[in-house]
């Protein structure tokens, strides 16, 4: 009896620890930003309908994330502000329709994911960023009927590294906080 239980537990552990590919669920993925507006208020907006994939090997504590953020899906709560954000002044959606993040390394402390290093491409320029994992988990989804992995990630960037310089000379901050929520279903 003990051998049967041990064999079943071993098989279950191998099944959950194997490498897998996950498809980003565009309905459970967004990237939001916040930028100080001349020390008076905070301007916010978000991108929705993110697409991409996550390769994750929980046992080896390795993975790769490749996410595309469509600039056309930007929303701010004000159509006038959204249109300005999409203009050549800021994101230049006509020339640069997508923002992309590709990971280079997953950083763990034991079994806990701490952060993901990677490259962010925006405005035709690529620079390294570190996404801090606020939380990360994998679970068996009762809705998707498969394993889903996801979490909340954050970083702060200097937007001028990507050539987004609007109003910097007038005193507006260079730093932008980015918060990303993502879930991806096992394929």
What are these language model-derived features?
Residues 18-187:
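Low-complexity, acidic/polar, glycine-enriched regions of mature
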Residues 1-18:
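Gram-negative bacterial Sec-dependent N-terminal signal peptides
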């Amino acid at each position: 009896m003990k051998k049967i239980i041990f064999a079943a537990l071993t098989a279950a552990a191998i099944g959950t620890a194997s490498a897998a590919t996950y498809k980003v669920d565009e309905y459970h993925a967004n990237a939001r930003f916040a930028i100080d507006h001349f020390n008076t208020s905070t301007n916010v907006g978000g991108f929705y309908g993110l697409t991409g994939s996550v390769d994750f090997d929980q046992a080896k504590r390795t993975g790769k994330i490749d996410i595309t953020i469509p600039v056309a899906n930007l929303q701010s709560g004000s159509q006038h502000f959204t249109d300005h954000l999409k203009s050549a002044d800021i994101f230049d959606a006509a020339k640069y329709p997508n923002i992309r993040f590709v990971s280079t390394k997953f950083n763990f402390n034991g079994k806990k994911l701490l952060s993901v290093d990677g490259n962010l491409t925006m405005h035709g320029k690529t620079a390294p960023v570190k996404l801090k994992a606020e939380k990360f988990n994998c679970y068996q989804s009762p809705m998707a009927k498969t394993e889903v992995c996801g979490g909340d990630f954050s970083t702060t960037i200097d937007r001028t590294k990507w050539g987004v310089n609007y109003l910097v000379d007038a005193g507006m901050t260079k730093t932008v906080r980015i918060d990303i929520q993502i879930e991806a279903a096992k394929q």
